[in-house]
C-alpha cells in the first residue's frame, strides 16, 4: 500500500516524465531534432549507434526523449524501446522519396506492437527546405497515414530541423495531446 501511495504522490506532486521515442531511417534528422530541443541550437551530429537520451521540459511537462538509430541493422532493436512510450515521433526525410516505402513498412509494423497501442504518433516531414521535398500532405499519403484515423491520435507537421522550423509546433502538439 505504501508503494502505491508513493507512486501516486510522485506522479501528482513531482510530475510524470513522459517517454517519447524518435524513430526514422538513417539520415532523417532525428538527432538534430533531439538536440535542437535540448540546446535550442544547431549541433553537428554523426550517425547514432544505439540511442541518445535527453530530458526536455516544456510547459511544465517533463519529457524523456529517446533518439533511436535508424540504420538498417538497428531497426530490429527499435521494439526494445517501446515499453511505456507515450509519444512516437517519426522523422521522415521528405527529400528522399525513394526510401518512403521502407519507412511506411517500418511504421505500420511498429504500430501493431502492443506496447505502442496507446502511444500518440507525430510524423515530422523533415528537410522541407530542400529542393524536391514532399510537403506534409504528400508524405501523409505516401505513408498511408489516413488508415490511422480513429485508431489513435496522430499528426503530421513539416519541419526543417537544421533551422529549427516547425519544431516548437511539434512540442506544442505533444503537450496539448498528453
Swiss-Prot record:
One of its GO terms (biological process) is vesicle-mediated transport. GO terms for cellular component: cytoplasm; trans-Golgi network. It holds the Pfam family Arf. It is found in: Golgi apparatus. It comes from the Eukaryota. A lipid is attached at residue 2 (N-myristoyl glycine). Disruption phenotype: RNAi-mediated knockdown results in disrupted clearance of intracellular pathogen N.parisii from intestinal cells. GTP binds at residues 24-31, 67-71, 126-129. GO terms for molecular function: GTP binding; GTPase activity. Its main location: Golgi. Keywords: ER-Golgi transport, Golgi apparatus, GTP-binding, Lipoprotein, Myristate, Nucleotide-binding, Protein transport, Transport. SUPFAM superfamilies: P-loop containing nucleoside triphosphate hydrolases. Coiled coil: none annotated. GTP-binding protein that may be involved in protein trafficking; may modulate vesicle budding and uncoating within the Golgi apparatus. Plays a role in the shedding of pathogen spores from intestinal cells. Belongs to the small GTPase superfamily. Arf family. This is ADP-ribosylation factor-like protein 5. It comes from Caenorhabditis elegans.
